[in-house]
């Protein structure tokens, strides 16, 4: 199994976040659903490990979401 990286996780979550926002869910629900999807794909312990080891997680996550679907981030 390939090691999950922060960039891989956030790109996957970012794509799903945008899809959930397009469906009309608010930011919080979209985020929770996206991380739930990531846990299903990569395994909850792998997702947790990447999050725990990451620094500047919030900045990186917001930057990726802003690039993927800025209309839902920048208001």
Predicted regions and their residues:
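Short N-proximal segments of mature Sec-exported proteins
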Residues: 2-49
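Compact alpha-helical subdomains of small soluble proteins
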Residues: 29-75
């Amino acid at each position: 199994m390939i090691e999950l990286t922060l960039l891989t996780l956030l790109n996957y979550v970012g794509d799903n976040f945008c899809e959930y926002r397009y469906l009309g869910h608010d930011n919080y629900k979209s985020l929770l659903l996206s991380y739930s999807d990531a846990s299903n794909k990569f395994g909850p312990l792998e997702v947790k490990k990447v999050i725990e080891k990451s620094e500047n997680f919030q900045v990186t996550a917001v930057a990726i979401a802003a690039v993927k679907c800025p209309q839902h981030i920048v208001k």
